[in-house]
């Protein structure tokens, strides 16, 4: 081992002989420092290349919509991984933040202690229900795109045992988990089925309330999606939809807008989005609905995107302890942030649509 006495005098090995840098031949000094510089340069270039490659990969959407099975498989995987359930709880949708919540910093890194992420989702359900103006005790409720059944069970608890809530999803794993949680929570009035929302197996005029929270994003035919929900709704029943929407046009989308929308379509298996106004037109176009109304809840929900990221910062162990999901989680974080920015600059909007059915379906 080499030791230094007093002033630093670097040394290196030539053959079996240790040579001081100060007394080394000029060519040896040149070789030493040139080699070190080359090594550091190569390392720097390697890191730069790796960073460029990673950014390119993260900016390239990797989970495009292909068919309904694509959506079912994605949610099957998320359900089995349990990471989404750990951070998002039983509700796979955004939360609701009042002006007072936002003023206190809810949804920020430190604001995670102001309002719990899962609490925000329960608040969303209650606010959506109030906005729907649904009668107090509907006999039958349909939850379209129910996930693992968080909202279905919340509605079953809210309305009581006299209300039967049915949730449908394309994911068999979600139905399994939703059913398991309903049994654990002693909620026999909440049931779940694997079913395509575009081809529902229910008779016309069945439900008093049809509830669709963040399921329209995955629908390849928005018109059919709306028409099917209206078909199974009873006369006098209420339809309420919460969904991510792209802004209306004009003005036309810029090239940057189109690039961002393409990413948001293809990273989380969305065929396409439509505007809030387009949804209202589809509901009105069924000719059996009245009192169609809309709202934009971007302000009330936008904090959710980063809130979900900060929840992981405060509680990273579930991800760090499972290296096999690091990359997928990183991709999801990137998409969450890109969603937040798209909503923040008005490219995306959080659409709320409701209406009352006035006559029976043919």
Where are these regions (language model features)?
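Substrate-binding/catalytic lobe of Class I Rossmann-like enzymes that use SAM or dcSAM, i.e.
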Residues: 252-350, 358-359
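N-terminal auxiliary segments of SAM/dcSAM-dependent transferases
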Residues: 31-87
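A short acidic, Gly/Pro-enriched loop at the edge of an enzyme's catalytic core
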Residues: 198-210
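Conserved alpha-helix/loop element of class I SAM-dependent methyltransferases that forms part
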Residues: 96-108, 118-139
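A short SAM/SAH-binding and catalytic strip from SAM-dependent methyltransferases
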Residues: 208-221
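Class I SAM-dependent methyltransferase SAM/SAH-binding core
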Residues: 140-142, 148-199
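Acidic carboxylate diad motif detector
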Residues: 241-243
């Amino acid at each position: 081992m080499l030791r230094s006495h007093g002033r630093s005098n670097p040394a290196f090995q030539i053959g079996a002989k240790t040579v001081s840098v100060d007394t080394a031949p000029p060519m040896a000094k040149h070789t030493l420092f040139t080699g070190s510089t080359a090594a550091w340069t190569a390392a720097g270039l390697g890191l730069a290349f790796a960073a460029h490659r990673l950014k390119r990969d993260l900016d390239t959407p990797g989970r495009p919509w292909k068919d309904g099975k694509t959506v079912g498989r994605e949610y099957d995987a998320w359900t089995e991984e349990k990471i989404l359930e750990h951070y998002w709880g039983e509700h796979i949708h955004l939360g609701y933040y009042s002006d007072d919540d936002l003023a206190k910093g809810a949804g920020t890194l430190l604001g995670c202690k102001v309002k719990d992420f899962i609490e925000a989702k329960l608040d969303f359900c209650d606010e959506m229900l109030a906005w729907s103006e649904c009668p107090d005790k509907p006999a039958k409720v349909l939850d379209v795109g129910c996930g693992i059944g968080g909202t279905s069970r919340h509605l079953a608890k809210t309305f009581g045992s006299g209300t039967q809530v049915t949730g449908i999803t394309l994911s068999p794993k979600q139905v399994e988990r939703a059913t398991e949680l309903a049994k654990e929570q002693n909620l026999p009035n909440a049931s779940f089925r694997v079913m395509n929302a575009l081809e529902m197996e229910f008779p016309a005029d069945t439900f008093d309330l049809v509830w669709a929270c963040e399921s329209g994003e995955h629908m390849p035919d928005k018109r059919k999606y709306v028409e099917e929900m209206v078909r199974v709704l009873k006369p006098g029943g209420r339809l309420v939809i919460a969904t991510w929407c792209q802004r209306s046009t004009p003005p036309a989308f810029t090239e940057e807008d189109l690039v961002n929308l393409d990413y948001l379509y293809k990273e989380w298996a969305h065929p396409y989005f439509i505007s809030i106004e387009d949804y209202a037109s589809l509901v009105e176009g069924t000719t059996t609905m009245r009192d169609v109304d809309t709202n934009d809840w971007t302000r009330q929900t936008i904090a959710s995107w980063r809130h979900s990221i900060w929840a992981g910062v405060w509680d990273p162990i579930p991800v760090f302890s499972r290296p096999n999901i690091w990359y997928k989680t990183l991709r999801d974080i990137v998409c969450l942030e890109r969603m937040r920015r798209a909503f923040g600059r008005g490219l995306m909007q959080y659409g709320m649509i409701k209406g009352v059915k006035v006559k029976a379906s043919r």
